[in-house]
């Protein structure tokens, strides 16, 4: 079994869109998932938004593969801050359930970190839903620490 990651191409867009739909389906029922879906999840048509990222010099889109088959993807973008510094923001990082725990997430995060460091980012941010312990642990094992908690008050039933 050969694992790897590489920059995405336009021919990968249908598969990345399929994986994006899978992550939206996986996260939506979790605590905080409904608001995440409405606010942060990629909107349809997914292929159009992903294609724009491929053409954006301030973004990097990766695919993770096992034996040449795409089983994951990641997206990071540069955010220019008020003080003139640059922050790398991981918008997506996802590996299909059956392909987890073999190091693909680590390959992608390492690539994204290198890419952001080369662009003189002061750091990187990533989001994990409350209670999604596996995601939190993954980021912590990669050297991330919490820097902000978002509090939410829901109205209605």
What are the functions of these language-model segments?
Residues 3, 7-11, 18-31, 37-85, ...:
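Acetyl-CoA-dependent GNAT
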Residues 85, 103, 134:
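Residues that form or flank phosphate/diphosphate-binding pockets in enzymes
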